[in-house]
Curated annotation (Swiss-Prot):
The active site is at D214 (proton acceptor). Autophosphorylated. Phosphorylation at Tyr-722 reduces its binding to RHOA and is crucial for focal adhesion dynamics. Dephosphorylation by PTPN11 stimulates its RHOA binding activity. Cleaved by granzyme B during apoptosis. This leads to constitutive activation of the kinase and membrane blebbing. The modification Phosphothreonine is found at T414, T1212. Residues 979-1047 form the RhoBD domain. ATP binds at I98, G99, R100, G101, A102, F103, G104, E105, V106, K121. It is found in: Cytoplasm; Cell membrane; Nucleus; Cytoplasm, Cytoskeleton, Microtubule organizing center, Centrosome. Residues 357-425 form the AGC-kinase C-terminal domain. Residues 1150-1349 form the PH domain. A zinc finger (Phorbol-ester/DAG-type) spans 1260-1315. The gene is ROCK2. The lineage of its organism: Eukaryota, Metazoa, Chordata, Craniata, Vertebrata. Belongs to the protein kinase superfamily. AGC Ser/Thr protein kinase family. This is Rho-associated protein kinase 2. Residues 512-530 have a biased composition (Basic and acidic residues). Residues 373-420 are annotated as: Interaction with NPM1.
Length: 1388
């Protein structure tokens, strides 16, 4: 890159160099190269060159090189500054992600500064380098940047950082045509419009010397007006001089790819722009039919159909397509040598399909589009699919150890449509004037937009009101729901409280019972004791009788003993009471002492507080006096402040007035300047206009003069010849003179205008001078006012300083006052607290005094009692002495009595021993009884608790039982209904069998009749043949007779006449026979047609009856299993299945499997659609139902024989490349015999089977050559079988779908296993099914594999195919495989 020479003179250089014209021109050329946005060395490219170099070199391993380190030290900082100044992703707010592809994503963004909405495409540099495809984005950038066509999405700017490339493009809110086709049934009128726009858009691309190569509805976007624009130019390729392209890889989307592009993957890649017209034909077919013309489930099928397009292209009978449309599609979908558009776009435009009254090829973009998108705002993205957030980690370049140059391929990518760098050229000024006009136009448009936005806001308000109403209704509903829930919770709480109360009641009852038991026990004890007492009394009476003599003495002794015991007891109680009183006296004295000490302490504290209070009161008085003085000072200060504020406000008003005057002066100055500039502009414009008009007039005069001279010359030459035209010439001359006079008057007027303009200019000059003088005077006044303002500001500052000082003093004083007030409050609080303490202590003291007085009174009473007790005790002692003396006298008597007593005692001891034995027995029994009773009580308690629990359980069980009873009742009812249904079904089956038999009999009759009719037909045909032969013979005979030469004899005339008569008779007979035969033929043909129609109807009825029979059989099978389960359940008193049920691992019975599966549906969308069907697998059949109602009504949608199953397997991505990647683990495939299928009527035609010559047969396989552009492995050698851009040649079996390298076949390797599928492809069908989960898919596959017969089913040679040979919904659903690149504004 050569640097431009510096502007200054080089030292030592000759002067001639600086003024060299050649050097200046070279500099201008260099400048032009730098300014040119298409130049590889423009300003942005140069800046891009520095930035990636720094990014690629700024690594520790590379910095070890001294040269690199010096370079980085020199340019690192400036490059960072450049990055900060250039546009970056942070300049935009991301609204939503509207598309995601292999290399990045498309975001809907709003520019922060201008608030404009754009679509921003992000391309990962790492992904592009990793996939070695870092060149496709250049075509896309260049086309969008430099196309300048209304048919191409515009690029506003492109920039980059170290991770991504960014392309800020025009946002297309209408979405793509895939979205339009999925939302609308496209009529031919619309298809005509969109095809025309696509043709014009492709013509624009072709005129740029490029071929698109990936034309499809995904890359056709609609703007806000509904008009079409092309996008995704990553596959574009530059044409050579001959308008052709050389390429060895097949590029594009499989459904839209042309045969010549497909052939290019074999190395014959040489084709032209006609490949794009093929794609237009596919697109038109898809719009009119709803699907692509060469659709197949597999990639191989699609490619084979495209290559065999002559045979595989067919139009469905039910599609309403005009002849012109069919003709255009066929003209596009043909060989490239004869394809429409090969000789230019004009032959397409002239096709009769495009003829209409509404638009033509020139004004199509100005006409209203068929569908104008309804947008709620400028960021409305309702026409784009919602894209899930990408939670994956962003991959970046690893840190290199040597120079790699990862950023170098992206140098020069940066582009700005409105480039402001180096924009001081005259062309830029012209651009500015154009821009100003554009701005004015945009302002007008904005006004219209504002009106529309106001209308929109009113609509939105109405919508919000409706939403508020909805919300209010919803809130009411929620309130009602909440109230319901609260009532339910209340009910539950009440029920729980009831249970608790029942528990408590039961416990209380238990306690009551226990107490009753104990009372009973005590009563029993009492009775026992009473009985013992009675027995003892009896014994005592016996003893009394025996010991009458000793009774008196013992009684006396007992009395004395009792008296002694009583006195001793009294003494003990008195001593105890005395001790207690002493203790209480001691404790009360201690308490009194403590209270007295507390009282003293409180009195001391009170004295101290009173002294402190006096001090505080004094301080408070002093502070109040200080406060009053401060207040006086403050009022004085506030008066001073008010005065100062008044002065300041006056000064401020003066300043404001001065500013207003200044502003007025400046305004006048600006107005005058503007007026001056306007006048200058007017003057210049007038001068330019005048000069221009003068030049124009002069030119016209010169022309008129030359013409006049020429006419004169011509007139002079041709006067003799054209004498009659002299008058006309003179009139013309007069007109010319008039024109000249008019031109002269115009010239005079212009001169007058010029003079007036000059006068005005002179007046304006005078005005300008005056205004300048005024401005100078005003400036002087402004300076004076500025000085006054400065003085005033100084004064204001001084006053403000003083004010601040006074305010600070005031603040200090107020703070001191506040602190004093706070301390006063605290002291008051403390004083109040102490007073409260004192009051409480005084109350305690008074209470203690009362207690002490009470205690003293009690002490006196107790002392009196003591004295009385002591006196009594002395009396008792004397009595005891006397009694002792009496006792001593009586001891003698007692001794004698004791001897007797001893004898009695012995007897008594023996009786006591016996009594003790009985008592111990009674005690042990009593203990055992009590223990037993305690255990019983515990058990009873447990029993009550258990009973409660049982009650609760019973309540629950009652509910459960009621529910179970209900279920049992319902089951019984169902059982009854089932039994009745079984009976009915059996009857129905019998009836159906009878009907079947009758139908079969009728069929046999019809067949017999058909056979007889055929025999009759054969007879008639034979008769016809005989008649024809007779006729030919007769004709030949006649020809012979006619060709014979007539003999001369007269006698033969009679023979001739006779033969003529015979001939006429024969002709007559022939005619009559012909008429008879034709009548008979018509009659028998009618009968044949009627019989065939009857047979078709009967066969349809038979199929329907057979399907209903199959469904009934499966229902009977299910009912039988349910009956068995019910019987087992009733026997074992459980509802669950018994041990006898043989169930599979998945919970279903071994013989039966049922659930929801989805079949592929074909409509006009680009995504794989599925329709749910309820599938039942019985022991013999697989039944498909549209819904559970159809199942109940025994109306199956399709029935398959299990005996006719060939193969069941899970699919791979290559088998269903159109399906979503998430759905593939849930899809499986069933292969079955054609005759084992019963279905409802066909809506779509059966796809034609390809020719067998295209298949390579090997080991039972039927291989189809193909290529894989997405991850696939060879099933023979397990090596990769794919590549993104140059995949190896591959083979795929159309029977078992095994995939392998083509080299294995070419080298005749024995790696390839033989084909596992043994069936005739012409008599077999495949069916794709989608399960709800991968587990369900595995379950279905495993269970169906078990049901496949070991021997493959032999095809029935006599089986007739049903007239209803397909389902309502076709199996082969159109799934669009995404293109290689990411399209703008939409998911790719």
């Amino acid at each position: 890159m050569s640097r431009p020479p510096p502007t200054g003179k080089m030292p030592g250089a000759p002067e001639a160099v600086s003024g060299d014209g050649a050097g200046a021109s070279r500099q201008r050329k260099l400048e032009a190269l730098i300014r040119d946005p298409r130049s590889p060395i423009n300003v942005e490219s140069l800046l891009d060159g520095l930035n990636p170099l720094v990014l690629d070199l700024d690594f520790p391993a590379l910095r070890k090189n001294k040269n690199i380190d010096n370079f980085l030290n020199r340019y690192e900082k400036i490059v960072k500054k450049i990055r900060g100044l250039q546009m970056k992703a942070e300049d935009y707010d991301v609204v939503k992600v509207i598309g995601r592809g292999a290399f990045g994503e498309v975001q809907l963004v709003r520019h922060k500064a201008s608030q404009k909405v754009y679509a921003m495409k992000l391309l990962s540099k790492f992904e592009m380098i990793k996939r070695s495809d870092s060149a496709f984005f250049w075509e896309e950038r260049d086309i969008m940047a430099f196309a300048n066509s209304p048919w191409v999405v515009q690029l506003f700017c492109a920039f980059q950082d170290d991770k991504y490339l960014y392309m800020v493009m025009e946002y297309m809110p209408g979405g793509d045509l895939v979205n339009l086709m999925s939302n609308y049934d496209v009529p031919e009128k619309w298809a005509k419009f969109y095809t025309a726009e696509v043709v014009l858009a492709l013509d624009a691309i072709h005129s740029m010397g490029l071929i698109h190569r990936d034309v499809k509805p995904d890359n056709m976007l609609l703007d806000k007006h509904g008009h079409l624009k092309l996008a995704d130019f990553g596959t574009c390729m530059k044409m050579d001089e001959t308008g052709m392209v050389h390429c060895d890889t097949a590029v594009g989307t499989p459904d839209y790819i042309s045969p010549e592009v497909l052939k290019s993957q074999g190395g014959d890649g040489y084709y032209g722009r006609e490949c794009d017209w093929w794609s237009v034909g596919v697109f038109l077919f898809e719009m009119l039919v709803g699907d692509t013309p060469f659709y197949a489930d597999s990639l191989v099928g699609t490619y084979s159909k495209i290559m065999d397009h002559k045979n595989s292209l067919c139009f469905p009978e039910d599609a309403e397509i005009s002849k012109h449309a069919k003709n255009l599609i066929c003209a596009f979908l043909t060989d490239r040598e004869v394809r429409l558009g090969r000789n230019g776009v004009e032959e397409i435009k002239q096709h009769p399909f495009f003829k209409n009254d509404q638009w033509n090829w020139d004004n199509i973009r100005e006409t209203a589009a068929p569908v104008v998108p309804e947008l709620s705002s400028d960021i409305d993205s309702s026409n784009f699919d919602d894209i899930e957030d990408d939670k994956g980690d962003v991959e970046t370049f690893p840190i290199p150890k040597a120079f790699v140059g990862n950023q170098l391929p992206f140098i020069g990518f940066t582009y700005y449509r409105e480039n402001l760098l180096l924009s001081d050229s005259p062309s830029c000024k012209e651009n500015d004037s154009i821009q100003s006009r554009k701005n004015e136009e945009s302002q007008e448009i904005q006004k219209k937009l504002y009106t529309l936005e106001e209308h929109l806001s009113t609509e939105i308000q109405a919508k919000e009101e409706l939403e508020q109403k909805c919300k209010s209704v919803n809130t009411r509903l929620e309130k009602v729901a909440k109230e319901l829930e609260e009532e339910i919770t209340l009910r539950k709480n009440v029920e729980s409280t009831l249970r608790q109360l029942e528990r408590e009641k039961a416990l209380l009852q238990h306690k009551n019972a226990e107490y009753q038991r104990k009372a009973d026990h005590e009563a029993d004890k009492k009775r026992n004791l009473e009985n013992d007492v009675n027995s003892l009394k009896d014994q005592l009476e016996d003893l009394k009788k025996r010991n009458q003599n000793s009774q008196i003495s013992t009684e006396k002794v007992n009395q004395l003993q009792r008296q002694l015991d009583e006195t001793n007891a009294l003494l003990r109680t008195e001593s105890d009471t005395a001790a207690r009183l002493r203790k209480t006296q001691a404790e009360s004295s201690k308490q009194i002492q403590q209270l007295e000490s507390n009282n003293r302490d409180l009195q001391d504290k009170n004295c101290l507080l009173e002294t402190a209070k006096l001090k505080l009161e004094k301080e408070f008085i002093n502070l109040q006096s200080v406060l009053e003085s401060e207040r006086r000072d403050r009022t004085h200060g506030s008066e001073i402040i008010n005065d100062l504020q008044g002065r300041i406000s006056g000064l401020e008003e003066d300043v404001k007035n001065g500013k207003i005057l200044l502003a007025k002066v400046e305004l006048e100055k600006r107005q005058l300047q503007e007026r001056f500039t306007d006048l200058e502009k007017e003057k210049n414009n007038m001068e330019i206009d005048m000069t221009y008009q003068l030049k124009v007039i002069q030119q016209s005069l010169e022309q008129e003069e030359t013409e006049h001279k020429a006419t004169k010359a011509r007139l002079a030459d041709k006067n003799k010849i054209y004498e009659s035209i002299e008058e006309a010439k003179s009139e013309a001359m007069k007109e010319m003179e008039k024109k000249l006079s008019e031109e002269r008057t115009l010239k005079q007027k212009v001169e007058n205008l010029l003079l007036e303009a000059e006068k005005r200019c002179s007046i304006l000059d005078c005005d300008l001078k005056q205004s300048q003088q005024k401005i100078n005077e005003l400036l002087k006044q402004k300076d004076v006012l500025n000085e006054d303002v400065r003085n005033l500001t100084l004064k204001i500052e001084q006053e403000t300083q003083k004010r601040c000082l006074t305010q600070n003093d005031l603040k200090m004083q107020t703070q001191q006052v506040n602190t004093l007030k706070m301390s006063e409050k605290q002291l008051k609080q403390e004083n109040n607290h102490l007073l409260e303490m004192k009051m409480s202590l005084e109350k305690q003291n008074a209470e203690l005094r009362k207690e002490r007085q009470d205690a003293d009174g009690q002490m006196k009473e107790l002392q009196d009692q003591l004295e009385a007790e002591q006196y009594f005790s002395t009396l008792y002692k004397t009595q005891v002495r006397e009694l002792k003396e009496e006792c001593e006298e009586k001891t003698k008597l007692c001794k004698e009595l004791q001897q007797k007593k001893q004898e009695l005692q012995d007897e008594r001891d023996s009786l006591a021993a016996q009594l003790e034995i009985t008592l111990t027995k009674a005690d042990s029994e009593q203990l055992a009884r009590s223990i037993a009773e305690e255990q019983y009580s515990d058990l009873e308690k447990e029993k009550i608790m258990k009973e409660l629990e049982i009650k609760e359980m019973m309540a629950r069980h009652k509910q459960e039982l009621t529910e179970k009873d209900a279920t049992i009742a319902s089951l019984e009812e169902t059982n009854r209904t089932l039994t009745s249904d079984v009976a009915n079904l059996a009857n129905e089956k019998e009836e159906l069998n009878n009907k079947l038999k009758e139908a079969q009999e009728q069929l046999s009759r019809l067949k017999d009749e058909e056979i007889s009719a055929a025999a009759i037909k054969a007879q008639f045909e034979k008769q016809l043949l005989t008649e024809r032969t007779l006729k030919t013979q007769a004709v030949n005979k006649l020809a012979e007779i006619m060709n014979r030469k007539e003999p001369v004899k007269r006698g033969n005339d009679t023979d001739v006449r006779r033969k003529e008569k015979e001939n006429r008779k024969l002709h007559m007979e022939l005619k009559s026979e012909r008429e008879k035969l034709t009548q008979q033929m018509i009659k028998y043909q009618k009968e044949l047609n009627e019989m065939q129609a009857q047979i078709a109807e009967e066969s349809q009825i038979r199929i329907e009856l057979q399907m209903t029979l199959d469904s009934k059989d499966s229902d009977i099978e299910q009912l039988r299993s349910q009956l068995q389960a019910l019987h087992i359940g009733l026997d074992s008193s459980s509802i669950g299945s018994g041990p006898g049920d043989t169930e599979a691992d998945d919970g279903f019975p071994e013989s039966r499997l049922e659930g929801w599966l989805s079949l592929p549906v074909r409509n006009n969308t680009k995504k794989f659609g599925w329709v749910k069907k309820y599938v039942i697998v019985s022991s013999k059949k697989i039944l498909f139902y549209d819904s559970e109602q159809d199942k109940e009504q025994s109306n199956p949608y399709m029935v398959l024989d299990i005996d006719k199953l060939f193969h069941v397997r899970p699919v791979t991505q290559t088998d269903v490349y159109r399906a979503d990647a998430k759905e593939i683990p849930r899809i499986f495939q069933i292969l079955y015999a054609n005759e084992g299928e019963s279905k409802k009527e066909q809506e779509f035609p059966v796809e034609p089977v390809g020719e067998k010559s295209n298949y390579i047969c090997h080991k039972g396989h039927e291989f189809i050559p193909t290529l894989y552009h997405f991850p696939t492995n060879c099933e023979a050698c397990m090596k990769p079988l794919w590549h993104m851009f140059k995949p190896p040649p591959a083979l795929e079996c159309r029977r078992c779908h095994i995939k392998c390298h083509k080299d294995h076949m070419d080298k005749k390797e024995e790696i390839i296993a033989p084909c596992k599928v043994y069936y005739d492809i012409s008599s077999a069908k495949n069916l794709l099914l989608l399960a709800n989960s991968t587990e369900e898919q595995q379950k279905w596959v495993s269970r169906l594999v078990k049901k496949i017969p070991k021997k493959p089913p032999a095809p029935d040679p006599f089986a007739r195919s049903s007239p209803r040979t397909s389902m309502k919904i076709q199996q082969n659903q159109s799934i669009r495989r995404p293109s290689r690149q990411l399209a703008p504004n939409k998911p790719s």
